[in-house]
Curated annotation (Swiss-Prot):
SUPFAM superfamilies: QueA-like. It is found in: Cytoplasm. This is S-adenosylmethionine:tRNA ribosyltransferase-isomerase. It comes from Pseudomonas syringae pv. tomato (strain ATCC BAA-871 / DC3000). The keyword Secreted does not apply. Belongs to the QueA family. One of its GO terms (biological process) is queuosine biosynthetic process. Pfam families: Queuosine_synth.
Amino acid sequence: MRVADFTFELPDSLIARHPLAERRSSRLLTLDGPTGALAHRQFTDLLEHLRSGDLMVFNNTRVIPARLFGQKASGGKLEILVERVLDSHRVLAHVRASKSPKPGSSILIDGGGEAEMVARHDALFELRFAEEVLPLLDRVGHMPLPPYIDRPDEGADRERYQTVYAQRAGAVAAPTAGLHFDQPLMEAIAAKGVETAFVTLHVGAGTFQPVRVEQIEDHHMHSEWLEVSQDVVDAVAACRARGGRVIAVGTTSVRSLESAARDGQLKPFSGDTDIFIYPGRPFHVVDALVTNFHLPESTLLMLVSAFAGYPETMAAYAAAIEHGYRFFSYGDAMFITRNPAPTAPQESAPEDHA
């Protein structure tokens, strides 16, 4: 299966660079999996597609202000993007500088703070901060907006590039399908008899990395930490028992649930995953999906194609472009019910790299 099969032309004007005034005011494109039928709605119309007894699974990761600016003790400027918090003082980070810092060298952080470069691990640098990492980031860090939002971060991004239910700090990118939900909508979902459960997947900067191979099967995903608790496993089992649907809010929720159901049975899981879901791979847990519009040739678009079917997904994206939907993190959303017999661009039998 070719990566090029997942390309499309997107007008620059459709890239959402700022959030709308209200979270819930986004548009919603619905895609019926069994028929491929599309409907153009508002995000609040999602309530009409939910049934009493359904279970919605959200990712409660919290985005940390992971971008820092500073300089080496020798004077050269640099930019740090924290990829993973290792403990209270140490992180793995991407460092952009004219010359990479050497082990043992000091880094002075703009706004106050100091770090030592401990070691290099392939493309990532292990840094040790003199003070606790999370309070330091809250004090002087910048929100790590995706590269396609080509503007400096603003104060409003601290609130809007964060879900209202975010709890567990550790992500360097938002689980963006969740950005459309405000507290009144969450309450309306509960009032309809829909249950909710929360997984955690700390989204890494690798989510924005392009696929650099020609054949999908040759791609290896970056690793991210996730946790699916026994409470989530029990909630899914109860949903199945009452005949409800498991609705994942975001591709990270899909990847969490499917990572914890490797053998077809959902079990508690805590640890790293590099699961890569693309057309031909079965889904063991998820029945419906809320998701944003994703980048061309991205692994997220491949996941959606695996769920909805390749021709149906590409037709939906063409319709979204024609109707002026806003794309990517601050953009509009889709509600997709699973295609029971999805087709791929060409025959392929993927291996599960999770």
